[in-house]
Structures are given as C-alpha cells and as structure tokens.
Amino acid sequence: MARTTPIERYRNFGIMAHIDAGKTTTSERILFYTGVSHKIGEVHDGAAVMDWMEQEQERGITITSAATTAFWTGMDKSMPQHRFNIIDTPGHVDFTIEVERSLRVLDGAVFVLCAVGGVQPQSETVWRQANKYSVPRMAFVNKMDRTGANFDKVVEQLKARLGAYAVPMQVPIGAEDGFEGVVDLLKMKAIHWDTASQGTTFEYRDIPADLVDVATEARSFMVEAAAEASEALMDKYLNDGDLSEDEILSGLRERTLKVEIVPVFCGSAFKNKGVQAMLDGVVHLLPSPADRPPVQGIDENEKEDTRDATDTAPFSALAFKIMTDPFVGSLTFFRVYSGTLNSGDQVYNPVKSKKERVGRILQMHSNNREEIKEVRAGDIAAAVGLKDVTTGDTLCAQDKIITLERMVFPEPVISMAVEPKTKSDQEKMGMALGRLAQEDPSFRVKTDEESGQTIISGMGELHLDIIVDRMRREFNVEANVGKPQVAYRETIRKSDVKSDYKHAKQSGGKGQYGHVVIELSPMTEEDRKNDSVKDDFLFINDITGGIIPKEFIPSVEKGLRETITSGPIAGFPVVGVKVKLVFGSYHDVDSSEMAFKLAASMAFKQGFAKASPVLLEPIMKVEIVSPEDYLGDVMGDVSRRRGVLQGQDDSPSGKIINAMIPLGEMFGYATSLRSMSQGRATFSMEFDHYEEAPANIADAVTKKG
C-alpha cells in the first residue's frame, strides 16, 4: 500500500503544560477542528475525548498520554493535507515520567500556558525536560478570555523564567470579556472567528486603529527574528526593510527547528478562538520527522549506528507506552523511526533478545481505534499482543539490529506497603501490580524479605494513590496501604572481637556437639576486594590441623549467613562484617552439621553484641531546584531534616541545591516542598550510601523493632 501522506507533511507533536492551563480543552479543540471529534468534549463536565481513564475524568487532570492521529488542511482549507500525530501529556509533577516518555518520541511540542497564571512551576520542569531532548516548540497562551489575562506578561515570563527567545506571531484583540480575536502579524490582518459555527469559519478584517502601532512594532520584532536565520535573509531585510511572508516563515521555521526561538500564539480554546491559527503554526513552524536528525542507536557489535526517516531504511521503532485495554488486552504504543511494518510481521526486541510477531496494528484516536494494515517511518500506532515488551524497548528488523537509546527513568522517591483486604484479593493483587509495573517503569513492586510485605514505590503520593485506585477499578482488588518503611542496616565498629560458643546436648542416645571460636571485625577496603565477599559479608576459615573437620566448615558459614539476614539490634540485615573461624572442637559421635550451624549462629549473636553494634540509615542524594525567593525556607528545612548541604548552582529556574538527607526524614517532602515554595520548587533524589544513625534515631527504631 502506498504512503498516503508524504513524511514531510507529518507533524508528531505533544501538547505540554501544567495543570489548569487548559491543555485538555486545547487538545479537544484540535480534534474538533481537524474533523475527528464531532461534539466538542468539555473538561468541565468530565467528558473530554483525550482524558479517557475514569480517574482522569473525575480529577479533571490528564494522567495518561493518549496518542491521536488527525488531519489538517489549514484554517482556510487551502493547504495540502497534513497528518498530525498528537500526544497529550500530563502536567502534574507526579507524572513527569509520562511527559519524559512522550518527549522522547515527539518531533515538536506546543506549550500551552494560562494567560492569567503564566509560567507555573510545572511549566519549568516540563521545559527543562523538553530542553534535555532538544524538542523544537512553540507556545500557545490560552484563556485570553479570563479575568486577569495578560498576553505581554506571559511573553515576558517565557523570557525571564524559562530563558526562552519568545517571538509573538500574533497580538490579541482585547482581553478578558473583551477578547475578540487576534492580529495575524504575518498578514497584518485581524482574524475574527464565527461563534455560531464554533470557530470553524472566520474572516479577516482591518486591524483596530488602537492596535496598529502595537502590531507594527511586534511585526518588526518578528521579522528581525526571522532575518537572523541566515545571512541572505539578513541582507534582504537590511536592504528592503522587510521580508515576504514566505521568507519570514522560512526564517522562523529554521530557527524554531534549531530550538533558538519559541513562536508564540494566543487565544481561548474554550471560546473557540485561536486554536485554528495555532494549528497553521504547527504546519509552518514545527518539524516533520524528516527535519529531525536521523535516530541514533547501537548495532549488535556495540558500534554507533543511525536510521534515516525513510520507508526504505530497515525497520526501527521505540515502544514508549504499554497499556492494558479492557477489550484487546495489552497495547504497545510505538513510534516508527524508519522502514515499514505490516501486521503479521515478526520484529526483534534487542533489549530482551526476543522475536515477537506483531498481530493487529491500531491507529488510535484517543480511545477509539481503527485497525490498519501497515505503518511507515514517522507513524505512531499501537500493536496488540506483544508479550515481552516494556516501555523504552526497541523493535527492529531481525536482519538489521539496532538498539535505540533507552529511556532513563528516575528512581522512585516514595514507597509504602500494600496488603489485600481479603484472601481472595491476594492472588489478584500480584497480577494487577505486575501489569501496572509493566505499563509504568517509574512504578516498582517488591516483596520486603524482612517483613514479607508487598512494597510499592513511585514518583509521588498522587502516583501511588492512583495505582491503588486503578487496582480497585480495573482489577477489582481492594487493598489497605500502610506507612512507608525505611530500610535500615546493622554493623559493628570494634575489631578482633572474640566469641566462643559451645552447643552441647547429651541426653541419652546420640547427642549434639558443636564448638566454635570466631573473631568479628568491620570489613576494610582491602577485605572488600576478596572474591568471597557476598551480601557485604566475608567469612574466612582459619582452622588448621583438623580441629574442626572439613565437612562441618560449610555449616559454620551457613549458620553465620542465615543469622546476618536479621541482625541482633532491630532485625535489619547485617552488613560490612568479617568473621574469622579461628578455633573450635568436635565430638566423634555427637557432632553434626546442625550442631555447628547453631553454634556459629549463637557465637555471632554474642560477639556482635560485644563489638559496638550500630544502626545504619540510608542517605539520599537530593537535588532541589528552587526560585531565589524561597531559598531561605528550603535550606532551613533541609537542616531540620538532618540534611548536609553539598553546594549550590544556578539555573534559569532558580538555585539548584545539592544535599545529603537521611531517607527517614524525606517522607512527605514533596508535599511540604510544594507548600513551602507555592509549588515552584522541584526535587529529585537517589540513594547514595549508608551512614551511622544518631543515637536517638537508633533508639526509636530499636524500640519499634
């Protein structure tokens, strides 16, 4: 089957924003104007097409990025048909992983901002993520009809807070209740959209007299930005004092693709004004897959390799989302970077070293789907029934293997225990959590060996709330959630501590006899290089002359290793200890493996108590990005949490504070940081090392244990 739309007319873009910028309403209008959605879905009554999971409709925030295909022939229907693959991304801080995941597979982005609220903290996080992947973007200042709307203020914030070179493409006509339309600076005409047709028809009018000067000034700024794209354009601009419409667009496009400028549009999605012109901007200014550099990866010999965005190149794609669909089972969303794939073809997954057959391929329109027979370079689609694919895996041709850059997912920052409410929920809970973890790599599940509890970890409290909520709704599993636990460890500080224990029982018949003398010491750096170190514990057999027969030595080691899984202080694992077996005795008849195992275990417990035992706590490496205004409060709070400041850096979003903070002090931190900084500070943390816990903490943990 031939390609219906040339790849140059594809636009794979995401709609990005913070909560309440009107992102979902904007996406809805895009679907309406591109002719996909016949009744406009309003987020206010919970019926938006893009927000298709139940909780999203209830909470009014977007959780899952749904991929949708739509077509556009321009606001005045005069363009050749362009194919849009639109990815709706969540704006809540607990879902930054979803944003990161969709940015990886996009070519461009539309950044939706609220004309009243402007650049919000979450906008800063999302902007930083877009910079990381060098995503060309344009901005849409939405909600121009709201009280307090101020277009110029938002453009200034784009420059000041995000360090963006913002270039307005329009000037609003009026604001708040008086918002009527926009001035198109390219054509120098006012655009008025027809309310009766919900904005599907429009007319050009003359610019209102009071806006002529403002528009003229804004236009020269725009033309100058375009002229800076190349020497040829700059020469023409300097000689003629102006550029043609095509020249302006080509200059602006070139600079947008290089992520040098951010063109800015405005409107009110709710009032059906402005989205249509912004879509024309997507066509004129955002890249097609062919405009982006060839995708990079490594071949089977670990050498760098690339794939061009053409149908004839070997097939390569990236799985960027896994979803469980109640009707078709597992859906794998993937972006095709090169080549062609037909339903029924086999693909190779180099990350798992497995072949998979692609059954049905679905083109998604929000949660409606259309079955298609093939996909080509630039397409975004969903495959049904791939078994071993996880988010971030590559799918490629078997004879031309390439592994595309894997997505790096942050470590979860919050954990808590979950237990099923009833016995019948037990098995279902395991299956449900497994499914959810496959869908979302930032969510982890493990069984705590010490407590036997199931521990779930994620990116924030809301993230885990929603996981528990989804278990209930989608898998009918009712669960109780507990308070998070910290994984402490135990060790000793004194060296060469001798411990002598004799396990002897004679009560008629065969008795039990095992006698060991051990020496306990903290492990040194030199000890750690020893190949016998396992689970941060070293056992050395120093017995000579058969004082203890060879066959009983493994039992001594086994007794020690079993004991260290639950330390004598509070039942946490013992780490960093070296034990030497130096002496002992045995009985010809009564000695057994069990007797030596018990003797070793008791000798260790007694010796551990004499060797200055201490409790270790996990220390997290924390990075906080905070605007200057809140720096004092944030740093004071770090000290209150027993944190040690490691240094500061500057960034466009404010100060970056690096600190080491005990994990036990970090619970509820996301919430308190948010309230301390009015939601403008963000943080990330990862485990760094274990350190001795202060006496008061150790006492509290021991009492609990």
Swiss-Prot record:
Primary residence: cytoplasm
Q: Name the CDD domains on file.
A: EF-G, EFG_III, EFG_mtEFG1_IV, EFG_mtEFG_C, EFG_mtEFG_II
For the ligand (GTP), the binding residues are 17-24, 88-92, 142-145
Q: GO molecular function: any one?
A: GTP binding
Keywords, sorted A to Z = Cytoplasm, Elongation factor, GTP-binding, Nucleotide-binding, Protein biosynthesis
This protein's GO CC annotations: cytosol
**Places the protein is found:** Cytoplasm
Q: Which GO terms describe its biological process?
A: ribosome disassembly
Region described as Disordered:
290-309
According to its UniProt entry, the function of this protein is described as:
Catalyzes the GTP-dependent ribosomal translocation step during translation elongation. During this step, the ribosome changes from the pre-translocational (PRE) to the post-translocational (POST) state as the newly formed A-site-bound peptidyl-tRNA and P-site-bound deacylated tRNA move to the P and E sites, respectively. Catalyzes the coordinated movement of the two tRNA molecules, the mRNA and conformational changes in the ribosome.
- Sequence similarity: Belongs to the TRAFAC class translation factor GTPase superfamily. Classic translation factor GTPase family. EF-G/EF-2 subfamily.
> What is this protein's name?
Elongation factor G
